[in-house]
């Protein structure tokens, strides 16, 4: 039953990601333009929808809030809630949680929400669609698989120092 719990925790992290995205685009998708290609960002600046400074600030805030928040979430789930001890127990749980979130990001956010709805459309940039190109998708899938495994291994190794 532990695997079911860990999958549910991954879904919880995916829901947090969706909430963060929904908050980010609540006043229009330009609020999350830092996640778009440089071409879309340039167009938004040219159209005076935003400034380079706002894009940089939003990207920094996104990273400063989300990365530590996601790390805290997975560590609390794996070590405080699930009671993982040792490298392997921590690693597999971290990997499953992050992988489930990654799948939700790829399919629910990228493919469906960004690719098939107008919620992420920025007026004046429609000719630059698809916003997530095949090349972008390949990078995201590569990072989402290899990257999540590396992050899980690093976090599990660090946590071995603190949790016995």
Task: Set out the residue ranges of the language-model regions.
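Juxtamembrane boundary at the C-terminal end of a transmembrane helix
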Residues: 155-164
